[in-house]
Amino acid sequence: MLLPACLRRCARLLFWIPVLVVIVVVMWSYYAYVVHFCWILLSSATQRVVFLCLFHLCFGMFSWSFWKAVSTPPSSPSVEFQFSTSDSLLYELERDDVAKSPILLEISQKLPVHTRTATGAIRFCHHCQLIKPDRCHHCSVCQTCVLKMDHHCLWLNNCMGFSNYKFFMLFLLYSLLYCLLIVSTVTPTVIQLWRGRLFDSCVKLHVLFLTLVSAIFAITLCFLLIFHIWLLTSNKTTLEWLSVPFFANGPGSKAFDVGVQANFLQVFGKKKRLWLFPVFSSEGDGHSFPLSCQMSSHGPPVMNGHERCATLRTVASPKEAAVTIAVD
């Protein structure tokens, strides 16, 4: 028992290596840009001040969003979704999955749960002993169920979900701006270095490598940010993109899509002044989400005939019409 526990601790430490790699690369880029580029290569004091101000603004917002994405723990389901001792005993006594289904169904009747497994059963986590809320998944790395789980990010050593997805989006945005700023401001100097007008080999190496690394990261981050913007405006998670969520009557690829604006507000909130800052402002509690009455493009309607359909909620703003929501 002692050895596996020790191995688990060592594995947790190894998970921090990618985070340290990111920190080291960013700190080196800070050194290369501020010292080698701004202080050594730039001759114009005005240009130096402007570049340093813009750089530190991007660096500050990047660092803030990075820290929030790394340090904010993923939200787990509340106590009401967890099995009581008696429920667990009753559930474990049944060895057949068919016999267990009525137990899960009875307990889930009191909960706002609409998603199902591909076979139509109630989604249950055997590790955490709880009924999974809609869009909740168990992370094998974090060893817990995560509300509205998007993915486990290797470079942040954290699960991206309901509590920190906004921070992840801002992290991508400010990372891209950080790289683009470096590329756009350093490129003219790189051209001079290429033409041989600057001869310091150490400075040349740092600046050339800085531009190359920043350009590569900028291209990668651009595609990643575009992908997550599409997910955000479609109200999908990465896991839902990979595997369509199922409901009582079948799959629902657009079940949570309540319109681009409302989808955006679910993550970033209604307070516009907080949109660009890594401060939590998402709507809801992460356990239940508005459902669209729009038909699934690859399956039957996302609604259950034994339950109510047409529950009205105001999703975007009081000035807009209420969105009709089908409760499965």
Swiss-Prot record:
Its EC number is 2.3.1.225, 2.3.1.-. It comes from the Eukaryota. Keywords: Acyltransferase, Golgi apparatus, Lipoprotein, Membrane, Metal-binding, Palmitate, Synapse, Transferase, Transmembrane, Transmembrane helix, Zinc. Autopalmitoylated (in vitro). Zn(2+) 1 binds at C125, C128, H138, C145. The active site is at C153 (s-palmitoyl cysteine intermediate). GO terms for molecular function: protein-cysteine S-myristoyltransferase activity; protein-cysteine S-palmitoyltransferase activity; protein-cysteine S-stearoyltransferase activity; zinc ion binding. It is found in: Golgi apparatus membrane; Postsynaptic density. PANTHER family: PALMITOYLTRANSFERASE ZDHHC16. Palmitoyltransferase that catalyzes the addition of palmitate onto various protein substrates. Has no stringent fatty acid selectivity and in addition to palmitate can also transfer onto target proteins myristate from tetradecanoyl-CoA and stearate from octadecanoyl-CoA. May thereby regulate target proteins association and localization to membranes. This is Palmitoyltransferase ZDHHC15A. It comes from Danio rerio (Zebrafish). The gene is zdhhc15a.
